[in-house]
């Protein structure tokens, strides 16, 4: 039987960093019953595998799952292999493109490989929601759909806005909140975690559990982590994500590129540093040193202490002593995708002319050529140590060359 901490201690621990608990008295009651019976709570968070590899934005919820796990409760890491085929419409102004089952399963495999970088295998259930949805018949879906109304669905801000703007809302999108809510019924969740943008879906889970004769789950929302741009939420589709499997130097360099203001938010959501200590650092620490400490902590969490030290040393050599890093990430880029015809730059000495905006996109620095053009105009790009402001540049055709965008560096080779 697990040994649980006093209820007040548990509440204080799980509330850290949260935005809203619906409802806190219910959570207290569930914790009291758990303490009295010795039965752990079932705490759920769902992740649709719409892209390969988890990123730091995902870990905000995963770290909160770990907090419940630290207290002795059972956590459920739910992979939405079925809901991923529907596509979460949250925050979308248009219907998401559908992914195939094969794509989703390939992505899901990477999630399964990475989940235990944060969670303990002993008290983690990894589940797939196709486990129950593939068994549902048409009549079951009609019964589920009867649990809500179109007018209730249109209360969602994104659906309401699209309806007002006369933009299409596909019928399958209306099923997404119901499907997510039904997950909670099937898992008998006591608590569900989600980002603030998921609040509507989480509340549907409460209503469905009640409709199916279960005690309603408590909803705990967490902040959305902004990506490297400091504006949009972290997402691979926005090109502003830091993957938890990225090489140590790449991860360290990306973290060093965030703004000083965003750094404190990362401290709060991605580390166990207490708020009192964060406030003291804001007053006393030099921002550069605080950012180095943040980057070192996060690289250590997902790699090792040795990798963290090495990444910091290589980054310092590169940016503070103007040396090339020993372990810059190497990427290959198809030559035909970036080269151009240019008598001025192309020559017979082993060099070739390339379009820099195309290279930045193909090498994974940016998500679009437009963003690449903006980086060039911002004087944020250097090739082999030389800042570049022209759209076309000459690079070695037969060997790798260093490209820097902000604090990120890669060794690029044309193939």
Located regions from the model:
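N-terminal catalytic cores of NTP/NDP-binding nucleotidyl/phosphoryl-transfer enzymes
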Residues: 27-89, 193-199, 205
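Divalent-metal (Mg2+/Mn2+/Ca2+)-assisted nucleotide/phosphate chemistry catalytic cores
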Residues: 18, 98-221
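Positively charged, low-complexity intrinsically disordered leader regions
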Residues: 1-44
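Conserved nucleotide- and phosphate/pyrophosphate-binding catalytic cores
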Residues: 208-415
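Short acidic, glycine/serine/threonine-rich loops at helix termini
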Residues: 87-91, 136-142, 230-234
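Active-site rim/loop-helix segments in enzyme catalytic domains that contact anionic ligands
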Residues: 66, 77-115
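Short, hydrophobic/aliphatic alpha-helical segments
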Residues: 38-47, 75, 176-186, 227, ...
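Buried hydrophobic packing segments
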Residues: 61-65, 178, 201-209, 298, ...
